[in-house]
Curated annotation (Swiss-Prot):
Protein name: DNA repair protein RecO
InterPro entries attached to this UniProt entry: ARFGAP/RecO (IPR037278), DNA_rep/recomb_RecO_N (IPR022572), NA-bd_OB-fold (IPR012340), RecO (IPR003717), RecO_C (IPR042242)
Known function: Involved in DNA repair and RecF pathway recombination.
One term under GO cellular component: bacterial nucleoid
Record's keyword annotation contains DNA repair: yes
Protein's UniProt keywords contain Glycosyltransferase: no
Family indicated by similarity: Belongs to the RecO family.
Biological process terms in GO annotation: DNA recombination; double-strand break repair
């Protein structure tokens, strides 16, 4: 293998048409972080590599380093998630996670933790019942933010730094997390959360949700909006998948779990 040729294991996050028959792939790899590579001829009807370029396919890849873009020369499929394609809500939630990862991930350095965590949450989403998608999405979003060091603070007041437990609180997007009630005058607060909402937010820091909490749809739908605001503020760009997600969650929605001020 030449010095310009390398191998990696990656999850396809995005694909865009390029020229008449090529695809521009954006792939999260364990070994090199985000890789942007051209798949030559991948859009042709008889392309051998075609199906391996679909979104969320996990491949063993061989790539060639180019001046501006790498080239995808070989791909061997290791894993697919057919469950994501069977439900629009699951697929949209997975695209939401992918969009967040695209904002968070870096190029040219290993991203093992981010890669492994995304794989876990895609597996959970692909297998989850439709009525638990909101829970799986919100937990995945928080966990992916945490591994990147940009998750909001959910256990301590961001003003006084005292622990917050079993109580109502505010949430400041600009301040990066929860604000104790006695500190509300010192921080701009975009959301007011009751005890249940604070407890649900704090559960997101655990490795997995409790079985009972998976059915707290009205809480998770509200907290998705809160985390969305946090992501959009931190990365200074909107999450496009959120628009379709609102439509998917509309039948489940009741009064919002996190109320913007």
């Amino acid at each position: 293998m030449s010095g310009k040729t390398y191998r990696a294991t990656g999850i396809n996050l995005r694909r865009m048409p390029l020229g008449e028959s090529d695809l521009l792939m954006t792939i999260l790899t364990r070994e090199n972080g985000l890789v942007r590579a051209v798949a030559r001829g991948a859009r042709k009807a008889n392309a051998r590599i075609g199906g391996r370029t679909e979104q969320f396919v996990v491949n063993d890849l061989q790539l060639y380093r180019g001046r501006s873009l790498d080239q995808l020369t070989q791909a061997e499929s290791l894993r697919t998630f057919p469950g994501l394609l069977q439900d629009l809500g699951r697929l949209t939630a997975a695209q939401y996670l992918a969009e967040g990862v695209l904002q968070e991930a870096t190029e040219g350095q290993a991203q093992e933790d981010l890669y492994d965590l995304l794989l876990v949450h895609l597996e959970r989403l692909a297998a989850t019942p439709s009525h638990q998608i909101a829970a799986r999405l919100v937990h995945g979003v928080y966990q992916l933010l945490a591994v990147g060091g940009v998750a909001p603070e959910v256990h301590f007041c961001t003003v006084s730094h005292r622990p917050i437990s079993a109580e109502s609180a505010g949430f400041s997007v600009e301040g990066g997390g929860l604000v104790a009630l006695e500190c509300l005058s010192h921080e701009r607060v975009g959301f007011r959360l009751d005890i249940e909402q604070v407890a649900a937010l704090q559960l997101l820091a655990d490795a997995d949700l409790t079985p009972a909490s998976l059915d707290w749809n009205y809480l998770w739908i509200g907290l998705e909006r809160l985390l969305r605001r946090h992501i959009e503020f931190h990365f200074d760009r909107p999450l496009r998948a959120a628009t379709l997600l609102e439509i998917c969650f509309e039948p489940l929605a009741v009064p919002a779990a996190a109320s913007p001020q």
